[in-house]
Amino acid sequence: MEVQKEAQRIMTLSVWKMYHSRMQRGGLRLHRSLQLSLVMRSARELYLSAKVEALEPEVSLPAALPSDPRLHPPREAESTAETATPDGEHPFPEPMDTQEAPTAEETSACCAPRPAKVSRKRRSSSLSDGGDAGLVPSKKARLEEKEEEEGASSEVADRLQPPPAQAEGAFPNLARVLQRRFSGLLNCSPAAPPTAPPACEAKPACRPADSMLNVLVRAVVAF
């Protein structure tokens, strides 16, 4: 009955709107969209109201039923605890006089001082007698490794460096040899001029022999 009444109400409302919007431009199209939204809204309201009415009797039934004993477990637990304990006993801790005294071993173990933690602070070398005595073992080991690496690198560099004889090439340094010869000739004292032979023993004039200096100059130019 309620659905029929709602349908009749929507029909009369839509007819009244169509009659009044017949002279408006685009009134019918607007009325159709408004009519659709009105129908959907009313259908939603009817559906929700019917659903609420169906759920109300289901909610009222559990309230009328007797209470379930499983819903109150704390009370049962308290009753069982009271029955388990005798009437004259109370669950209170024993006094200090009746408790057992701890043994000597336990007291010594509790009172024993804890081992001192190893200090991780580095000691300064100024407080120690020797230079390496104040260093931490790890630092000393690192320094030794660094020195060994430097020694190995120097040995490799010495091996890779060519000897001086190989650096000059296959032939000896000619300039060095000539320099020694020239310095020897220049540093020596000039020889005494030869005495002229007598006229009777005069021989025909000939070309004088070349000096050692001229020979060396020619050799340098030819080379």
Curated annotation (Swiss-Prot):
Residues 125-138 have a biased composition (Low complexity). GO terms for cellular component: cytoplasm; nucleoplasm; nucleus. One of its GO terms (biological process) is cell motility. Expressed in activated T-cells (at protein level). Expression increases in metastatic tumor cells (at protein level). The modification N-acetylmethionine is found at residue 1. Induction: By growth factors and 12-O-tetradecanoylphorbol-13-acetate (TPA). It is found in: Cytoplasm; Nucleus. Its main location: cytoplasm. The keyword Acetylation applies. Residues 63-172 are annotated as: Disordered. Residues 69-78 have a biased composition (Basic and acidic residues). Transmembrane segments: none annotated. Keywords: Acetylation, Cytoplasm, DNA-binding, Nucleus. GO terms for molecular function: DNA binding. DNA-binding protein that seems to act as a transcription factor. Involved in the regulation of neuronal differentiation, acts upon JNK-signaling pathway activation and plays a role in neurite outgrowth in hippocampal cells. May mediate with FIBP FGF-signaling in the establishment of laterality in the embryo. Promotes cell motility, seems to stimulate tumor metastasis. Belongs to the IER family. This is Immediate early response gene 2 protein. The lineage of its organism: Eukaryota, Metazoa, Chordata, Craniata, Vertebrata. The gene is IER2.
